[in-house]
Amino acid sequence: MVLCLKKKTEVKKVLEIGLGTNNENVISNMGKYGKPGASIKAFKEFFSNANIYGADIDKEILFKEDRINTFYVDQTNIYTLNGLFKKIGKNFDLIIDDGLHASNANINVILSSLKFVKKNGYLIIEDIPFKAKHIWEVVSSILSTKHKTTLVKTKQCFVFIIKKN
């Protein structure tokens, strides 16, 4: 789906929520052998002209390097999401929610971030459990009047894709 954004060199601004903590005391962690920030580092290489932003609830894994800035966010608290966008601005080509894999947190991301996605940009919610399909069908029916929505079934989960019109 990322490949259909546009030419990868034209992508200028990407956000990933959920950097992949390896702190087993943090909900929705990758386990102690996980590598925090691996995906945003891959985005930095893939989208060679983009500024990459990341956000996570685990303050211990936040970092900054060339073209990458990371910030604290609690997806269950819409005020921290709103505060994140005050810091990082708008006009995102791609926002990926790979953080807390819970519908309430995912919906908070949609409510706070969709307005910051560029026209023809994408907001992607990853790792949706099969049992939550009905929730995302409702979300899709609400959003589909203004945006193109797709619920993609993979072997392990669903992925919800919003293309902003």
Residue spans of the language-model regions?
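A short alpha-helical cap/connector motif
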Residues: M1-I96, L100-I125, P129-N165
